[in-house]
Curated annotation (Swiss-Prot):
Protein name as catalogued: High osmolarity signaling protein sho1
Pfam families listed in its UniProt record: SH3_1
Organism placement in taxonomy: Eukaryota, Fungi, Dikarya, Ascomycota, Pezizomycotina
Species assigned in the record: Aspergillus clavatus (strain ATCC 1007 / CBS 513.65 / DSM 816 / NCTC 3887 / NRRL 1 / QM 1276 / 107)
Residue stretches of biased makeup (Low complexity): 209-222
Membrane topology classification: Multi-pass membrane protein
Entry's family note: Belongs to the SHO1 family.
Biological role stated in the UniProt entry: Plasma membrane osmosensor that activates the high osmolarity glycerol (HOG) MAPK signaling pathway in response to high osmolarity.
UniProt GO cellular component terms: plasma membrane
Positions bearing carbohydrate: 100
Side Cytoplasmic, residues: 1-14, 68-69, 126-292
């Protein structure tokens, strides 16, 4: 499971507000129930079970939000909260009509809990593509893929810049004097030695003194000098929660399917160096993966 970070709650106004209200409502219901149980002989027992159950649900939601795993455990959260809504509703129906003020205060606490549960079910039960969820997540400072919820799936560039792997600058232009014998012997592609009918057209003689293979620098390891060395260790394992198609213009990215298991060398950045079971290596967006 992902690491719990308090900043995921403190930096998310929606999470901070709903969790705070839920804790306050639970405290009101708990203290009022203690007083009502002392003053009343027929205080309903199921209200105590509702208090204990909602304590666990509130802790669970706090952990899920703090670890930013709402997409992973959203279905389970909705299921538990649905049962909690039934318990709090029954407690409200039983206590709100009591003549005791402490029982009515406990009912008020359960009403607040029920309202928060409804909001949570609507949030966690909605898909990431839902408009309201994307709007809520847009205010979060540390939400993974915060601006990606308006699309069919989270895009990897929605939460940060990845390392530059393609050139965006204009190509360097050289003159014939600067090249000094390194021009190609085929001015027109597909016609070795020049265009048809050109003077001294020959595919066997270099026209501009092309360097022979003996003059080229030797490469002992068989790799380009500009190629980034691949890591030798992949200590982490991650599971893909979405399918991803690599950018065809970027040879460093890799494609993978949903639920595929990848080996990861470093998890500190937004883009992870990963290796597939087939041995293919490359970079993968971290918001498409979850550590195992």
């Amino acid at each position: 499971m992902a690491r719990f970070r308090a900043s995921n709650i403190l930096g998310d106004p929606f999470a901070l507000a709903t969790i705070s209200i839920a804790i306050l409502a639970w405290i009101i219901a708990f203290i009022s129930s203690i007083i009502a149980n002392i003053k009343m002989a027929d205080y309903p027992n199921h209200a105590w079970w509702a208090i204990a159950y909602m304590f666990c649900c509130t802790i669970g939601v706090t952990v899920v939000v703090g670890s930013d795993t709402g997409l992973v455990y959203g279905v389970a959260v909705v299921g538990y909260l649905s049962a909690g809504l039934v318990l709090t509703s029954l407690s409200v129906n039983t206590l709100v009509y009591k003549g005791n003020s402490s029982a009515q205060a406990a009912a008020a606490g359960f009403i607040l809990l029920s309202m928060i549960i409804i909001v949570w079910i609507f949030y966690f039960g909605s898909t990431p593509q839902a408009t309201h969820r994307g709007f809520i997540d847009s205010f979060a400072l540390n939400k993974e893929g915060g601006n990606a919820y308006g699309n069919g799936r989270p895009i990897s560039t929605a939460f940060g810049h990845r390392p530059e792997t393609t050139s965006t600058s204009a190509p360097q232009m050289y003159t014939s004097a600067q090249l000094n014998g390194f021009e190609t012997s085929s001015p027109i592609s597909g016609y070795p030695g020049g265009a048809p009918g050109s003077e001294n057209r020959s595919s066997s003689q270099p026209r501009f003194g092309n360097p022979s293979a003996s003059n080229l620098p030797a490469n002992n390891n068989g790799q380009s000098q500009d190629e980034v060395p691949q890591p030798t260790e992949y200590p982490y394992r991650a599971k893909a929660i979405y399918s991803y198609d690599a950018n065809p213009e970027d040879a460093n990215e890799i494609s993978f399917s949903k639920h595929e298991i990848l080996e990861v060398s470093d998890v500190s950045g937004r883009w992870w160096q990963a290796r597939k079971s087939s041995g293919e290596t490359g970079i993968a967006p971290s918001n498409y993966l979850i550590l195992l």
